[in-house]
C-alpha cells in the first residue's frame, strides 16, 4: 500500500475523474492503496450513479474548474499528496466554436487550481500533474516531436493548453512546486467518449457488424496521429509524480497511423477488408467481396485547421523512469471494437453514463462504501417532476410509482404528458441541455432526466430543453441524431409500442441541444465535428 511516513495511505485529488483518463488513473491508484478524491460536475447522468455505493477508497466532490471558491473549500477540507489535473474541454473541433469557454476551463481553470494550492500553502507538499497535449506542436513541427520541439498551436484548444503548460512550468520555477506537464499524444480505449473520431469509428463498425448500420462518414482520412492506449499513458502519468523533481515529459508510442489506417484495423477485427477509391472529398471505402460502401468522406467534418502529422518520442520518459507502451495500434483497436460490439448487443452503446467503473458491485445489504460531498443546490438524486418542478428523490424517502420494480436512484417516469419550453433569458452563446432517455423501465414507462446545470431556479420563467424522443424497437438502434425532433415547443409523451417490440435491455442515448440567445435550437451531433451555428426546425412528432 502507498503510504506517507508509514502513517496513512497516500491521497490523490483528480479533476476530470469521470473521464477516460480519470477512470484508468483511479484503477491504478486504488490498486496501489491510495485514497482517491475526485472532482465531478453535478449533472444528472452522474447523480444517477452517485446514488449507488462507490468503490472503496473513492470520495467525490461536486464542483468545476470555473469555481475557485469551491476548489478552495474542497482542497482545504482534505489531506492530499498528489493532484492530477485531467479536467478539460478536450474537443479540438468544439474549441473553434467555443474558444472563450475552452480557455476559461483549460487555461484559467489550471491557474485557479494552482493558485488555490499556493494560497493554501501546499506548494512544498503536494505534487501536481498537468495534462497537456501533442496538439501544442501545430502542423509544422518536424517529426518526431520531443520536449524540446518548438510549440505552435493552431486551435483554440491547443492555445489554451499552451497556457496550461506554461503556467504549470512557471509555478514550478517561481513557487517551488513539484509540478510536471504530461505532453500526451492521442490515447484511446473502450472508455473513450463516442464523440471522438476513434470511438466513432469503432462504434460504427460494431453497429455494422451487428447489422444495425450500413455505412458512416468521416472527415480527413489523411490526418496522422500517434495513437496509444489510455491505460499505458496513465501508468506513465503516475510514474511522473514519483520522480524526485517535477519536469515535462512526452508520452507517445513513436508509431504514426492515419485515420484511414485506424478504419482498416477496425474493420479487420470483424473480418472485413476495406478497399479505397477516389481522392480527398470523393474518397470512399468499399467492403471487398460485397461491394458495399462502408465509409464516405464528408467535408463538414474537416477541422478549420488540421494537424496532419503528429508523431512523438518518449525517449526522456523511458530514460527517466522506464516507461514504454505495452499496446500496439492493432491490440488497441481490437479491444475497442470487441467492447463496442458487446455494448451494441447489450443495448448500452449510447449510454451517457459510462461510469460503471466507479461503482462497488460487491456492496451488499445497503452498506455505503462511498462519500459524496455536495452543496444543497446539487443533491445526488434530484429529479425532475412535472407537477412541481425539481424535488429530491433519492434512495431514501423517494416517491415511488405504482410499479415497485423502479430501482432506487432511478429518475421518476415521465407522466402522461410533459411540455418543455425554452428557458427565458438565456444568455447569448447558448445553453447546453442534456437528456438521459432510459427507454422503458419495468413498468413500461419512459424515464427522463435533466442535467443539474439546467435545473430551474427561482429566477427561471420556464423549463429548459426542447426535444421529443421516440422509443427504440428491436429493429431501430438508438442513434442520437436519428431520434431527435425539435421545434420551439414540443410535448413529450410516453411511447406506446407493445412490449414485444422493445428490447429487454436498457437503452440510453445522449441528446445534447443548445438554445441560443433568441430561444432558437441548435442541433448538436454525437460526433466531434458538429456545426454549432446550424439552426434546425423539424416537425413535431406524431404522438401515439
Curated annotation (Swiss-Prot):
Functional pathway: Antibiotic biosynthesis
Catalytic activity: GDP-alpha-D-mannose = GDP-4-dehydro-alpha-D-rhamnose + H2O
GO biological process: 'de novo' GDP-L-fucose biosynthetic process; antibiotic biosynthetic process
Broad class of enzyme this protein falls into: lyase
Catalytic site: 135 (nucleophile), 157 (nucleophile)
Chain segments carrying region Disordered: 366-406
InterPro entries: GDP_Man_deHydtase, NAD(P)-bd_dom, NAD(P)-bd_dom_sf
Pfam families, per database record: GDP_Man_Dehyd
Family of the protein in this entry: Belongs to the NAD(P)-dependent epimerase/dehydratase family. GDP-mannose 4,6-dehydratase subfamily.
Protein name (record): GDP-mannose 4,6-dehydratase sdnI
Species for this entry: Sordaria araneosa
Classification of source organism: Eukaryota, Fungi, Dikarya, Ascomycota, Pezizomycotina
